[in-house]
Amino acid sequence: MKRTFLLQIAMIIVAAHACAQQKTDVQAHRGGRGLMPENTIPAMLHAVDLGVRTLELDCVISSDNKVVVSHDVYMSAAFIRKPDGTDITKEEEKQYALYTMTYDSIRKFDVGTKPYPQFPEQAKMKVYKPLLADLIDSVEAYVKKHHLKPVYYNIETKCSPDGDDKYHPKPDVFARMVMDVIKKKKIADRVTIQSFDVRTLQVIHKTDPKQTLALLIMNKETFAANLEKLGFTPAVYSPYYLLVTPELVKEAHDKKVQVLPWTVNEVSDMEKMMSLQVDGIISDYPDRLVKVAGSYQQK
């Protein structure tokens, strides 16, 4: 009898843990750059296969006003090669500002074959920076073809006050261009717009008040101080993971704000974040995170 009782208790604990796992939003940082070339269509499809709920990605604007998926506002020397196959040097990388280049020229640069020492597990392949519209089309078609649950998107606007009209348009124009793509693709209810720059969030909060917004945080100021700068309460507060404390999580949850730490790559840190009851985790290694938090696609 005692053994049966203990077994029942163990089963309840396991079931409760499984439920908790399914509540954690597993997000593939730049599509999971620890495994695949960052911010590319192959990375996103691979992340879907792994079982993530959300694809995290970044956007910039080209000279011909196309919304391009890219973290950097220029061609990074760390992992990009020129169309002729030669490496971009650190000294010249900022000469290749994407806002000064047409998308046709951007697409000719190889972002997937150069060895990337920071991510030794990353698969190597010749691939390019995609348009946001094309990435969404590819993911949506893939999900439909394989009869999967619809996935979500967490899209960062890569902008800053000192980059206006140099690396990107002003925030109102930037925000409108990104939202135009999202609305055209009819996925707004599955999209979060995130930014360190409060300006694009403020614009979208006014023009599209129902759009889910996330404030990215890297500073050590208080939750209240950061929200005061923003001017409204966002749906999501997304701090660097070492800034997450039990007190921060409670303060955010008391205001009905989700906490989404970035970028969490070690399993021990993932487990710690989950123990703090964060709402989601952004990771370069979604394979590790899925093992800890469970698969979104698991039936």
PLM regions: where:
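Bacterial Sec-dependent N-terminal signal peptides
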Residues: 1-23
